[in-house]
Amino acid sequence: MKKIMTIVALLTVTVSMLAQHDEGDFTIQPKVGLNVATLSNADKSIAHFHLGLEAEYMFTDKFSVGFGAMLSNQGAKYNATESLERYEIDLDYVQVPILASYYILPGLAVKTGIQPGFKMRAKAKFDDHKVDLDKLYGLYNNVTDDNAKVSTADISIPIGVSYEYKNIVLDARYCWGLTKVLNQGEAFRNRVFMLSLGYKFQLTD
């Protein structure tokens, strides 16, 4: 009996320490994390970072809507071919996630929504300056901005899960790109797994 009571007490303490938000709560969350990014036609993924701020409003104790702004570094790696040496594409976006979240348990939420993105920079890195770049994004130098052909906007669908404990939030989501990265030519799209750590500040009593 004592063991059962001890287990119950521990479970009670654990549950009470989980984040429980009430209807009408409004929070902001600075966050930083890792991107494992690729493009739909790429050979290899690439590790990059993201950082930003998200806000969340609880419509009920289980359902919330949130939005944010994040600087997200994305891209991919490509193996060497007969005409090109190996190269790496770097894409910087300001991503604006708009998410609906449902709390299955206190602190544990599943989420999805839509994520518009706005291109800030597009670069490519090559091992050899002598590679003919005319057929690849119109680039002619080792690292050059490609404003002519890379789409300025990106739309993706994020699907994820988050766990909150004492205001600390661990978030994992996968962003499935819908729009083409290039305005013309081959139709490849962003694919990004994001793992982040954040801290929630409650702005309402």
Locate predicted features.
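Outer-membrane beta-barrel channels and translocator barrels
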Residues: 21-23, 58-60, 105, 165-168, ...
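Residues on the lipid-exposed face of transmembrane beta-strands in outer-membrane beta-barrel proteins
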Residues: 30-34, 51-57, 69-71, 96-102, ...
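Flexible, solvent-exposed loop segments that connect beta-strands
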Residues: 41-42, 73-92, 120-153, 180-186, ...
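Helix-adjacent hinge/juxtasegments
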Residues: 83-113
